[in-house]
Amino acid sequence: MPETKPDSSSVRSLPAAAASRSMVDSFGRRIEYLRISVTDKCNLRCVYCMPVEGLPWLKRDEILDYEEIARVVRVMAKMGLRRLRITGGEPLVRRDLSSLIRMLSAIDGIENIALSTNAVLLEDQAEELKAAGVDRVNISLDSLRADRADTIARRPGTLDKVLRGLAAAEAVGFEPIKINVVLMRDSNDDEIADFAAITRERPWHIRFIEIMPTGSNTDLSADSFISCNEALERVRELGDLKPVQGPLGNGPATYYRFDGAPGTIGVITPMSHNFCDRCNRMRLTADGQLRPCLFGSIQTDLRSALRQGEDIRPLVEETLRIKPERHWLVQGSTEGSGGLIALSQTGG
């Protein structure tokens, strides 16, 4: 499988010896991307992610400390890991996150560190995170209307805080900025055109994401599902869209652009057109479970091995070996899921 040449503008220098290493699963997919959940806690209660009453939080001693996370990344970087994404819950609620970023950015072989956030706390942390080594940010924003944003997030004042976080991200030079919009019929689908129009004015990547049945949201997912194909049909009413050639990141989005627009429109289709054949990632949960797939029950306990001083490389290799070919979710059904848990508990 040919290796994609990274964008030199956002990738740290990589020694030749490190560049030759790679992790390849049983289906020939190169795994070079790890999503790291640093906390299961969140300061919002988004309807598609977490029940209104919250969830039982992990105890402090159940969560990996920063040195334990760095140990996992050091081992996996020697095996071919190249890119990291810091997630939660909401990662910015974890104290002194920038110290972890500094540790991870110093690890040989790591090319890029991204952050997924709801941006509520980003205004005060953007500059420090940029200096520590975060290269880019993805920001969740499901409505451009203040009352509706509050309804979806179940917290007051959400939109204003997110927009201030966005402004701070731009001011410190995060590029590109990606905005994730979870599509929900009869909730925010009437804003599809409004979000798309932003790309004609701003160099942002607006990404429409199909809602997935996870945790307690299976009924919502079934009732609210709208495909990205339908979203694109609505966007095309604004003008012609052209596919964007080449990768614009580490993930599964397919991108389009209006003629002359500085920004792009992306679609992420886990339900209508799964992208498992090009999956390049694994997930490390806040409590130290290495998950080869977002869906399903397969996970490997790295925390116990770390705390007993054991070599975790064999565990990583075994998890890589048993990574499934695809998830088996069908819209409106949880059959084959192996027991879904909330996105806040897996890092999405």
Predicted regions and their residues:
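Glycine-centered loop/turn positions within well-structured domains
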Residues: 44, 146-147, 274, 300
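Secreted/processed peptides and extracellular or luminal domains of membrane proteins
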Residues: 48, 52-55, 228, 282-285
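Short glycine/proline- and charge-enriched loop/turn segments
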Residues: 52-57, 147, 215, 299
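Radical SAM enzyme [4Fe-4S]-AdoMet core and its adjacent flexible, acidic
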Residues: 3-7, 14-16, 142, 147, ...
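Conserved alpha-helical substructure of the radical SAM core
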Residues: 2-111
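Radical SAM enzyme core and accessory elements
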Residues: 1-24, 273-348
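Short capping micro-motif at the N-terminus of alpha-helices
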Residues: 265-267, 292-293
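Radical SAM/AdoMet-radical enzyme domain recognition
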Residues: 63-86, 93-209
